[in-house]
Amino acid sequence: MRQMIPVLLLLTLLLPAAAAAQPPVTRAQFVAALWACAGGVPYDANGPFSDVERDSPGATAIAWAYDLGVVQGTGGACFTPDRPVTREEAAMFLRRYAAHLGRDTFLPGGAAACNDFEDISPWADDSLYWATAVGLLEWSE
């Protein structure tokens, strides 16, 4: 649980801001906050995405997260850093990071606790179920 505290801090700081009347949290901001919570280790900012300049905010975090397998692109060698992060993406990023930390991310119960599972993209369903089950995300109606 100790290693999950930075992730809980991340969610406490970022996700309420996204739900309020403030600008939504971008994909780059979310990944940068995750990287900072993980210790903000120095990392080569030269990542694989054509829309993330080496000196842009979040470039180091995005390259770090990509190399760990936490993030992937949005297609066409792009990351789309300025697009708001979706709850599906947030859940996916968090689950992949938890797996990187060696946490159990298996969820045998699946959609039982989810009330809008028919609206979830198939690529994100397990991650959303997991993030909800472990208390990282709340399910909304």
Model-based region annotation:
Residues 7-16:
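Bacterial N-terminal signal peptides
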Residues 18-61, 68-91, 95-125, 133, ...:
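Feature responds to low-complexity, polar/acidic, surface-exposed segments characteristic
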Residues 1-5:
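Bacterial N-terminal signal peptides that target proteins for export
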